[in-house]
Amino acid sequence: MKKHLFLLLFLPSVLFGQNNLKYAETIKVEDLEKHLIILASDSMEGRETGKKGQKMAADYIMNHFKNIGIPPYKKKSYYQKFKVKNGRHMCKCDDCDTDFLKKMLGKNKYIKGENVLGFIEGTDLKEELIIITAHYDHLGKHEDKIFNGADDDGSGTVATLEIAEAFMLAKKEGNGPRRSVLIMPVSGEEKGLLGSKYYTDHPIYPLENTVANLNIDMIGRVDDWHENGDYVYLIGADMLSQELHDISEQINNQHIGLELDYTFNAEDDPNRYYYRSDHYNFAKNNIPVIFYFNGVHEDYHKVTDTVEKIDFNKIQTITRLVFLTAWELANRDERIQLNKTD
């Protein structure tokens, strides 16, 4: 009898653990491609923060959240609107045409943008929060040139849309996350990480309740250092929580099998990627982060960063890795621990 009772108690956790793969497999190439064809189209005018195209992209993301059943946060709005002083342009490589970027991005003293909130309330641990981010803004247009930003960061944005849909399907089927999950495409990244900075200054949950941030920025191309797309650069996972790094490794080894490349995973990396995307605003608030990144390529910050060059199988694989990692963080009994400091 005791043995049978143990098995009955153990069975729900086993089934809950098996569900992660079921929902991960709903993240598919055709859906990622469908979203990116729209978000990286000329009609979005390059999605520059504060401009018409960015507002159109925000509406597209909001409508996706609405259509899959995510309600407005606190029944009020899907948007966290901000008006902040223009920052400095962000560039993930050292050979960008900075004079050109300043002309494009430095015209307005104040910037109005929106972060889009896809909030999925948890169950017994709902007061703790996992945040998944990607920036949906890009460089906009200049004269007759449109910077579509298919990889930067259309690729990460469509990943968040599919992660949101997978979590919502789980919730509808009675397998929703124990911790709350916030899928938050942000704007203002190209102008100085403005949207994520605004969020960490005005969080919807206390920052001390935020367990981790998983940030996705450029996952749709292959850089010059790799022969194929079976890799992803991970940055930051062990800097604040070795436990987060270990979980990430375990999930990948068990379910995905990518090469996890830590080439740029150092605070003193000369490329300074740790400081160049939205995860940094969480990390500097002592929130563990992972930054998922494919590296820069010849079309980075150019009008040639277009949809037809995207490797959607690569996006699918990395998106499933992010989802499975978030699933584990949201459903484990104990929240991950910060590294001990002397």
Task: Report each predicted region and the residues it spans.
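Second-shell loop/turn segments in exported
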Residues: 19-26, 42-52, 102-107, 143-153, ...
